Curated annotation (Swiss-Prot):
InterPro entries: Anion-transp_ATPase-like_dom (IPR025723), ArsA_ATPase-like (IPR053262), ArsA_HSP20-like (IPR040612), HSP20-like_chaperone (IPR008978), P-loop_NTPase (IPR027417). It is found in: Plastid, Chloroplast; Plastid, Chloroplast, Plastoglobule. It catalyses: ATP + H2O = ADP + phosphate + H(+). One of its GO terms (molecular function) is ATP binding. Transmembrane segments: none annotated. ATP binds at residues 65-72, 182, 328. Homodimer. Belongs to the arsA ATPase family. Its EC number is 3.6.-.-. This is ATPase GET3D, chloroplastic. Pfam families: ArsA_ATPase (PF02374), ArsA_HSP20 (PF17886). One of its GO terms (biological process) is protein transmembrane transport.
Amino acid sequence: MVSLVNSSLTCSSLTLNLLPILRTETPSLSRKRRAAYVAATSSRDVNDTAADSSQKLTKFVTFLGKGGSGKTTAAVFAAQHYALAGLSTCLVIHNQDPSAEFLLGSKIGTSPTLINDNLSVIRLETTKMLLEPLKQLKQADARLNMTQGVLEGVVGEELGVLPGMDSIFSMLELERLVGFFRQATRKNHKGKPFDVIIYDGISTEETLRMIGLSSKTRLYAKYLRSLAEKTDLGRLTSPSIMRFVDESMNINSNKSPFDGMTSPAMWDTLERFLETGASAWRDPERFRSFLVMDPNNPMSVKAALRYWGCTVQAGSHVSGAFAISSSHLTSQIPKADFVPLPFASASVPFTITGLDWDKILLDQANSSIRELLSETVSHGTSLTQTVMFDTAKKLVTLFMPGFEKSEIKLYQYRGGSELLIEAGDQRRVIHLPSQIQGKVGGAKFVDRSLIVTMR
């Protein structure tokens, strides 16, 4: 492990090209004028989104922050905004908190509930989600007879949820909605893919694990392949297991990516499959995450900074930061702490009778958050480089916001071809270019960045 030394570094600023979005001329804008304006805005946004491809890809948006910081409020705000802009939007709730129902003024079920023509909402429940994969396994087993009828006797409705199942099954359901690995199979009420999926998960920690799932699974797959190909037990059992997986994925007319392949080809395909998934979380055109904080709560602000660094460690990026308040701000928003992220704020006043989303969305005080949401879903923003290589000086610069130097550990394995960074209960592997591969000569922590010197 290399010790870290303090110094200073200036972060580059972020350049934005803001889009025209919904604005209000007066608080009393008539519904007819509002509808016409929204229609024009919607047309621009949807056309911009689809301009570069004939097959529109579903965007995935989520929010990260401390519990009670306003993640659910931000998710509902974003869902209402995108729906108002004419984008087919699905808000996915994966918790039992009734807050979303209050914010929407509607009950949420385990199948999509239509709030309006552009907005659907669904609550994920793991007890329901585990039934469909079990059904597919049973159908595959009926063809292959691997368990000799034992699997057929399993009653899915009596199975409880074990730790870890929530993240696994939510990822499977989100794959159907978004299509990280293959084309999305779950459609809106018009039979078309959704334009935007807004996800409000169980917790920020669970969401971060989900974000890093594909990249982290690749190393496990590598070791499993070695076990399958180099041991007697692996050579005996892996062909049957791989065939079972192949058959299960072919159920319901979904052609398996492993269809008809040999075991080595299936492992190669799995590696490419996982890389496709990992690249989707890195792609600003597909994935957006926003930090959410209560500006009146210093702990909420500190947590947002930490989750920024944790997202980088998970192998993804943060697109912006939101300050959500139910009343007027009583403290100064710490925008400087989040440079170079774009920062926006919104006030969502609660009443006993519910929320008037037309009034909230068209409030000029909330224009900055609408601008940021529209910008990121339509064109994306310039993102801070989290890893930079200087081959001339043999330097590796790792942007690690939210961490102190004592919280970062640096390791090196595999003959100097990569670095292993541990921070925020996440491990990240940095593959080094051939020009700077070698042993670590030193490291220092400089204004939210770890600068490693190679020799």
